[in-house]
Curated annotation (Swiss-Prot):
Location of the Phosducin domain: 28-201
Keyword Chaperone on entry: yes
Polar residues bias spans: 217-227
InterPro entries per UniProt: Phosducin-like_chap/apop_reg, Phosducin_thioredoxin-like_dom, Thioredoxin-like_sf
Protein name per the record: Phosducin-like protein 3
Any Gene Ontology CC annotation: endoplasmic reticulum
Function in brief: Acts as a chaperone for the angiogenic VEGF receptor KDR/VEGFR2, increasing its abundance by inhibiting its ubiquitination and degradation. Inhibits the folding activity of the chaperonin-containing T-complex (CCT) which leads to inhibition of cytoskeletal actin folding. Acts as a chaperone during heat shock alongside HSP90 and HSP40/70 chaperone complexes. Modulates the activation of caspases during apoptosis.
Lineage: Eukaryota, Metazoa, Chordata, Craniata, Vertebrata
The organism of origin for this protein: Danio rerio
């Protein structure tokens, strides 16, 4: 009698007709198939994980999985670096009104945009442009732009200059309008950095508002001056 499990063309025909039962899968083949499915499952898990998740779950994987895990970690790291490189700016860029939609509204998901409306001949505008150029180099992940007010917004009043608009994902998150908001020509780069950090545009390493330090120094100076004046009056009375 012919072996029903034999790999013959006739047996294959009988199996298709339902005369013979399906061929039994050897135990070793079943185990290999299960290992393959498990491996695919592990790979899919790696693909779905972020770099942080790979680090957190590293101890849960067996030694056999280390190569696959390292491969996907490197892949994720390369993708992250590529994404970071795409979002590096590092300079204060001049734009016109025609560039506004592309440079601001379509800057990219999660990109902070700082736009300075200015006009030549206004000293405070020039000072802020200097500060922004410095901050653009310090915070290359944020986009720093400048535009002559009349080319960006027709008939924009000069009394509102300088003006800073802060955007993210095409939405305005903060605005600073007019010279009084900036404190005049005494504005320092650290003060401007702090203001922008409060809006979320940059992540500052400053531990406290530099304006507060100036105010504290000013108050100390006033108190010292008042004490000196009072001591002088007391000396005059004694004479």
């Amino acid at each position: 009698m012919q072996d029903p499990n034999a790999d013959t063309e006739w047996n294959d025909i009988l199996r298709k007709k339902g005369i013979l039962p399906p061929k039994e899968t050897p135990v070793e083949e079943e185990e290999d198939e299960q290992l393959h499915l498990q491996s695919q499952s592990v790979v899919k898990t790696y693909e779905d994980m972020t770099l942080e998740e790979l680090e957190e779950n590293e101890d849960e994987f067996s030694e056999e999985d280390e190569h696959a895990m390292e491969m996907y970690r490197l892949k994720r790291l390369a993708e992250w670096k590529a994404n970071q490189m795409k979002n590096v700016f590092g300079e204060l860029k001049e734009i016109s009104g025609q560039d506004y939609v592309q440079e601001v509204n379509k800057a990219g998901e999660g990109i902070w945009v700082v736009l300075h409306l200015y006009k030549q001949g206004i000293p405070l505008c020039s000072l802020i442009n200097q500060h922004l150029a410095q901050l653009a180099r310090k915070f290359p992940q944020s986009k720093f732009l400048k535009s002559i007010s009349s080319t960006c917004i027709p008939n924009y009043p000069d009394r509102n200059l300088p003006t800073l608009f802060v955007y993210r994902d095409g939405e305005m998150k903060a605005q600073f309008i007019g010279p009084l908001v900036f404190g005049g020509m005494n504005l320092t780069c650290d003060e401007l950095e702090w203001r922008l950090s409060e809006s979320g545009a940059v992540k500052t390493d400053l531990e406290e508002n530099p304006r507060k330090q100036i105010q504290d120094q000013l108050m100390t100076s006033i108190r010292c001056s008042a004490n000196t004046h009072r001591d002088g009056e007391e000396d005059s009375d004694e004479d």
